[in-house]
Structures are given as structure tokens and as C-alpha cells.
């Protein structure tokens, strides 16, 4: 059955890990190059244009294509509050957040990364607080990952932290999912999946807080479960200051 196939696919071999790592590296390299263009490059462009631009850059670096069925997510300003926002013709403005959820497909394996950039130094203090809360939840969840721990227990670590920060309904999806030949594979970091983690599973960790009409923050890495913990396949930091475009 497909459940059996998915269970087998959850644990990756060395070659699968290598290809997933390559997919992460290419995605991040393309995103870094895009950020290096500076705020001026972003301001005035539509979400659709930025989505296409990042997709093109990933392919230019050797990706087969971007890894999502519906394309790269780009949500600017209040649109960053849509957890699965489809890019529109809205033009990016100065001093606002732009959420990018993107990934590359390389030789059949996917990556899935989310970062938020800011098109100027004026960041709403409320948004800054949300960013730091999400970053802490992201980091705590990664520290909690180890073999034999239940997937649901990892979700709880991040969810509890976000709840203590005053947000419950605003974190409106699971913490993450297995990734491999498909972007979303069977094992999920959510409240109902009690699958014990195993060495060499590759999982996303993507806490988020979304305030309708205001903004949203999600930070996502792809992590490899190791013998005694986990290792992030990402090199791109989550430090807010690094994502302020000048």
C-alpha cells in the first residue's frame, strides 16, 4: 500500500540525503543572490515577478525546477499573513515584510525553505516581536528533535512557545513535514501524528504566526534526524538583521 511505501521513503539513504542537501544549497544560493540585489530591486516589483525571478535563478544554478506544485510563495505586506498565499500583482513597497517560501527540485529531490525579508529599516515593533517569537520556536523545535521522539512532541514544543507568547489561533498549520521526492511526505509534525522519529528522516521545521490584515512570519529549515539529534541542512541564518534589505 502507499502507506507502506511512504513509511519506507521516510528514512533516506546517503544518496537521497546528498541530493536533498544539494536542493537546499541551490535554493539558498539563489535566494541569497536575490537578496544581494538590495531593496531597490524588490520595491515596485509584483509578487508574481519576484516568484518568477527566484525560480529562474534556481534553475540557472542547476535545479530542474522549483519544487512546489503551485509555485513559489511570495507574500508582501499584509499578504505575508496568508500561510499559503498565491503570488498576486501586488507591488512590493518600501519598509514592509516579504515572505518567500521556496524550494528547488534536484535530480528528483526537493527542498523547502521559508524566510522573510524587509524592504527597509522601519519595521513595526509588533512585527519584530513576532519575528523573534517565531525564531525562538524554530530553534527550540530543532533542539528537541531526536530519534524515538514522537513527531507530535516536536510540534508541541514550538506550539507551546508560541502560545506562551500570546498566539494560538495565529499558528494555523502543523510545524512541519517529511520531505524527499515530494515536498510533503507522510510523517508530519502536528498534534495528531505520533510517529516516532528515526535516524535519516528529513523533516521541515516551519513555525509561523499570521495576523490577518497586518503581516505574517514563518521560518523554515530542512533538518536531518541524526543518531542523537538533528542537523539543519540550511546555512542561511534566521537573524532578522540579515534580512533587512538596504
Language-model-detected regions and their locations in the chain:
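Active-site neighborhoods and metal-handling regions in enzymes and metal-associated proteins
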Residues: 1-246
Amino acid at each position: 500500500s502507499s502507506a507502506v511505501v511512504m513509511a519506507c521513503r521516510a528514512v533516506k539513504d546517503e544518496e537521497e540525503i546528498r541530493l536533498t542537501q544539494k536542493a537546499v544549497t541551490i535554493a539558498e544560493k539563489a535566494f541569497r543572490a536575490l537578496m544581494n540585489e538590495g531593496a531597490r530591486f524588490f520595491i515596485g516589483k509584483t509578487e508574481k515577478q519576484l516568484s518568477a525571478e527566484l525560480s529562474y535563478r534556481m534553475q540557472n544554478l542547476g535545479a530542474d525546477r522549483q519544487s512546489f506544485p503551485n509555485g513559489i510563495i511570495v507574500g508582501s505586506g499584509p499578504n505575508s499573513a496568508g500561510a499559503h498565499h498565491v503570488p498576486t500583482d501586488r507591488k512590493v513597497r518600501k519598509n514592509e515584510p516579504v515572505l518567500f517560501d521556496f524550494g528547488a527540485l534536484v535530480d528528483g529531490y526537493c527542498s523547502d525553505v521559508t524566510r522573510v525579508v524587509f524592504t527597509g529599516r522601519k519595521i513595526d515593533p509588533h512585527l519584530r516581536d513576532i519575528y523573534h517569537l517565531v525564531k525562538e520556536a524554530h530553534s527550540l523545535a530543532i533542539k528537541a528533535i531526536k530519534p524515538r521522539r514522537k513527531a507530535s512532541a516536536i510540534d508541541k514544543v514550538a506550539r507551546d512557545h508560541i502560545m506562551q507568547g500570546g498566539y494560538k489561533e495565529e499558528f494555523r498549520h502543523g510545524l512541519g513535514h517529511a520531505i524527499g521526492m515530494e515536498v510533503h511526505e507522510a510523517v508530519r509534525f502536528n498534534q495528531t501524528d505520533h510517529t516516532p522519529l528515526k535516524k535519516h528522516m528529513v523533516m521541515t521545521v516551519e513555525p509561523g504566526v499570521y495576523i490577518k490584515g497586518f503581516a505574517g512570519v514563518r521560518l523554515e529549515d530542512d533538518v536531518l534526524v541524526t543518531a542523537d539529534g538533528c542537523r539543519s541542512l540550511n546555512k542561511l541564518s534566521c537573524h532578522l538583521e540579515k534580512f533587512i534589505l538596504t
